[in-house]
Amino acid sequence: MSTSTIEEPQGGLPRNYLRATLLLLIGEAPAHGYDLLEQVSQLGLGKVDPGGLYRALRVMERDGLVSSSWEHSSAGPARRTYELLPDGTEWLHAWAGALRESHRYLSIYLGRYDRIIERHSTDTVAPPSAAPAAATDP
């Protein structure tokens, strides 16, 4: 980009997608926090702070979107398993609707952007037939 003072856009998904992503993953199958941490990273949210993920899970539980229960194992320490509750399913439906609307807008935006780039690339790059003729001596 140029040296202007405009801040360059950040790549990846915004942090506020963490809650929606956690609900999606828990809706697919009950899961432990560590498993969710790995799955979130694989979906493109980038490196997620484990503390932030567990805080989000606790808030979602407090808000009645998920429930948790302890799963005891003879092979290791007890682990908390998270499950989606009906309010979490409603919230997930609402997010899906909002994301569909965002997808529609982004498709329009990117289509228009592609047309600009296409137009500018043909304006700035001379076609081979328009190359200047070599100078000849008289």
Regions found by a protein language model. Give the residues of each.
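Short, solvent-exposed loop/turn elements at beta->coil junctions and helix N-caps
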Residues: P9, E71-H72
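Basic, amphipathic "hinge/linker" alpha-helix immediately C-terminal to the N-terminal HTH DNA-binding motif
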Residues: S74, A78-A96
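N-terminal helix-turn-helix DNA-binding core of bacterial DNA-binding proteins
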Residues: Q10-Y54
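Glycine-centered, phosphate/nucleic-acid-interacting loop/turn motifs that mediate DNA/RNA or nucleotide
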Residues: G64
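Short beta-strand "wing" residues that participate in macromolecule-binding interfaces
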Residues: S68
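Intrinsically disordered, low-complexity serine/threonine- and proline-rich regulatory segments
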Residues: M1-T21, L25-E28, A78, W95-Y105
